[in-house]
Amino acid sequence: MRVGITLACTECKNRNYASIKNKKNNPDRLEVKKYCKFCKSHTAHKETK
């Protein structure tokens, strides 16, 4: 079952990215290092609802 998620920056809390994930393969929250245009650096982005 694939669901839509948003990824929020852990430093400035802005929601920068939208993505989809398979809940069966990844039941826990996703965390990815991505570029944040507000922080102007690569930071960790966590899955939000």
UniProtKB/Swiss-Prot annotation:
Family: Belongs to the bacterial ribosomal protein bL33 family.
Protein name in the entry: Large ribosomal subunit protein bL33
GO biological process: translation
PROSITE patterns reported for this sequence: RIBOSOMAL_L33
Keyword presence, Ribonucleoprotein: yes
NCBIfam families: PRK00504.1 (NF001764), PRK00595.1 (NF001860), rpmG_bact (TIGR01023)
UniProt source species: Desulfitobacterium hafniense (strain Y51)
Glycoprotein in keyword set: no
InterPro entries, sorted: Ribosomal_bL33, Ribosomal_bL33_CS, Ribosomal_bL33_sf, Ribosomal_zn-bd
Domain of life from the UniProt record: Bacteria
GO MF term (any one): structural constituent of ribosome
GO cellular component terms, semicolon-separated: cytoplasm; ribonucleoprotein complex; ribosome
Keywords attached to this entry: Ribonucleoprotein, Ribosomal protein
Gene that specifies this protein: rpmG
